[in-house]
Amino acid sequence: MRTLVMVACAVSLAACSSPPKPPTVSGRHRIPINSPAAQEELRLQVFPQEPTAQATMWPARPPKQTVSVYFPQDVTVFRPTSAQINQLHTLLWPVPKHINVRGLTDNNCPPPGDTQVARVRALAIYNWLINQGVSASRITISYAPVKDYASNAPLSPGRVLNRRVDIEILRK
């Protein structure tokens, strides 16, 4: 029995002394080390909490937009509503290349007072734009008592559309 145990131990030791076979490589699971994706994955493993930069883009804007601000009869003071302020601020950023401000009135036969009203309305919008941070060199003012009618109606509801200042925003 003793010999049998000795022979079993000798066979066991002889089996352990032979080196294992090398693994066979198929190439199915190869990962290129220098590819951009692999480098980005490695960077994220090394610096996991590093924030990634995200690009912020302004929405595409048309090259020209016009907004009309309407005034009551013979009123020249510009008191914008919160909706008008939000609309104008949205149009003013990013900063436009140029802004044309055109003051208009509603009479077909312009008395001298209508020219003055159109001018003062345009200046009120001009001053408001400057107070909002727009450079004066980017703004052009014009005014005309009889021009560019939005409505040819001689009655009050149609004439309201003609008492306005057009703000034309040019992007190119």
From Swiss-Prot:
Superkingdom in the source lineage: Bacteria
Subcellular locations according to the entry: Cell outer membrane
Give membrane topology per the record. Answer: Lipid-anchor
- What keywords does the record list, in alphabetical order? Cell outer membrane, Lipoprotein, Membrane, Palmitate, Signal, Virulence
Concerning InterPro entries, the annotation shows: OmpA-like, OmpA-like_sf
- Residues with covalent lipid (N-palmitoyl cysteine) sit at 16
Q: Please name the Gene3D superfamilies in this protein's record.
A: OmpA-like domain (3.30.1330.60)
Q: Which cysteines are cross-linked by disulfides?
A: none
Q: Which GO terms describe its cellular component?
A: cell outer membrane
Q: Where is the OmpA-like domain?
A: 58-172
Question: Under what conditions is it induced?
Answer: Specifically induced within macrophages by phagosome acidification. Induced at 37 degrees Celsius in minimal medium, suggesting that nutritional stress is a regulating signal.
Listed Pfam families: OmpA (PF00691)
* Signal sequence, start to end: 1-15
| Lipidated residue numbers (S-diacylglycerol cysteine) | 16
Other known facts: Transcription of the operon is maximal in early exponential phase.
Q: What function does this protein fulfil?
A: The VirB system could be required for the establishment of the replication niche in the host.
Please state what the protein is called: Type IV secretion system putative outer membrane lipoprotein BRA0058/BS1330_II0058
Q: Which organism is it from?
A: Brucella suis biovar 1 (strain 1330)
